[in-house]
C-alpha cells in the first residue's frame, strides 16, 4: 500500500522512479525518495472514506480519528537517514473496510485507488523537538483519551505549528 504514496510523490515532483522489492523481503530501505540531495521517507495511511474527505478539504480536527499523522517512536533510530524528513500521504478506503478485509489479500479498494492526498511533511527537527505520546490529542467534547497501539510522534497537517505544513520540498 505504501508504494501508492511513493508513486504519487514521484509523479507530483516529476522525478523518475524505480520501485524496489524490499517490502516482501522485509529489508529496511535507504529512503523512499532521494530529491535535491535529501532523503525522505514516505508514509501512507489507508483512511476510511468519511475521514478521507475531511482530510482532503482540511476540515479534520487533530483529535478526530485519522486527524493526525504519526511516526512510531520505535523507528526513531531510522530518522537520521531521512535527511529531508517524512512525507505523509493518504489513500481512501471504504468506511466498512475492516468488515470486508480478507486476510492475505489486497483489498479491491486499494487496487483501484484513483487518488492519493499528499498531506505534507515533517523535518527531522519537527520530530525530535517533540516528545512521543501514547495518546491522540484530547477531544474537547469527550472526557476520555484515545490510546495508540504504540508510542508515537504526532503531527496535524494544519495546526499552524510547523508540523507537516504541506509546503514545497
Give each language-model segment a name:
Residues 1-34, 43-169:
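Nucleic-acid endonuclease domains
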